[in-house]
């Protein structure tokens, strides 16, 4: 039997997430709650763990306390078997400076690579919502002989200009890696589609080390994985694309096969939540064969009393809905909605309370927000604009701990 390759997982989780403000005012983007019982980082960690990649370093920097705590409490593996998921804050090993980019984060954390001495390194982002079996991508990387493999998702060519785009040949070799081009390239088999980078990479270890070292010595570099490292390897003919559409996840439905969302804006974050709530959801949280992990809390079940109801909604553990109406919404844990309140098309994060007769529509309420009796959010946007953040799509976002 062929020995399994030695793989180290590195998750880039230092992002500030300015476009998600106010949700990122007090936490790193990967720590933002999602889906009623998770945090954004749980999706990438679940994909790696489900694929049995069990040596994982999570590189953190910006306001990382809640992220570090979440990983430590909810992602404990067996140290006796050499398995670990460990948060690694920026440590200034190479001098008194923080990470200046994702490639610099790898450069300043090279000791992790030397200590583990892997054959291959999986470097994934921490802030996307999706299911993926990364082992299939690693196998293609090994078989192709590439030094680097970039996961690409197919999007309509007319929509690809907002992303980093991949130009590849019939063999999968990448000929060009172009950031937000005016005229995106088609895929080899369909000129109306474009491969867009998902921010997920596989590297042969020596190739990565050499590229990171060369980049560190380049004063003109922004020290970014997608902007500098991958183009460097493309120029050397060492990069290949992995078609995400070929990834087969156990238990996936026809509807959520190939689902991937960048939730970097308030509108995208909101829309991804709305993908969860229908009877046959666009993204199915309930796939037991490829579970999303990390959301376990020792809480009582949700409770509905005095005729309270929730339709086409996800309701987290410990929540209580009393004589209130919830529709097309996602409620996290320990949310309380009092008599006569109405919640429609909204995302409510842990510990929020919505008072008697209050109305919340088309809104995101962060943790521990209190909406007083009779108050309204998302009903009068002119009034809300004076108090809260409002997205381009009209989603009202209320920051953590605000009393209304």
Curated annotation (Swiss-Prot):
Single GO molecular function: glucose-1-phosphate adenylyltransferase activity
PROSITE patterns: ADP_GLC_PYROPHOSPH_1, ADP_GLC_PYROPHOSPH_2, ADP_GLC_PYROPHOSPH_3
The keyword Cytoplasm is annotated on this UniProt entry: no
Region forming the signal peptide: none
Pathway: Glycan biosynthesis; glycogen biosynthesis
SUPFAM superfamilies found in the cross-reference section: Nucleotide-diphospho-sugar transferases (SSF53448), Trimeric LpxA-like enzymes (SSF51161)
A Pfam family that the UniProt record links to this protein: NTP_transferase
Disulfide bonds: none
Keyword line: ATP-binding, Carbohydrate metabolism, Glycogen biosynthesis, Glycogen metabolism, Nucleotide-binding, Nucleotidyltransferase, Transferase
EC number(s) reported in the record: 2.7.7.27
GO biological process: glycogen biosynthetic process
Sequence positions that bind alpha-D-glucose 1-phosphate: 99, 164, 179-180, 197
Source organism, top-level taxon: Bacteria
Catalysed transformations (reactions): alpha-D-glucose 1-phosphate + ATP + H(+) = ADP-alpha-D-glucose + diphosphate
General function of this protein: Involved in the biosynthesis of ADP-glucose, a building block, required in the biosynthesis of maltose-1-phosphate (M1P) and in the elongation reactions to produce linear alpha-1,4-glucans. Catalyzes the reaction between ATP and alpha-D-glucose 1-phosphate (G1P) to produce pyrophosphate and ADP-Glc.
Family (UniProt): Belongs to the bacterial/plant glucose-1-phosphate adenylyltransferase family.
Protein name: Glucose-1-phosphate adenylyltransferase
Organism: Mycolicibacterium vanbaalenii (strain DSM 7251 / JCM 13017 / BCRC 16820 / KCTC 9966 / NRRL B-24157 / PYR-1)
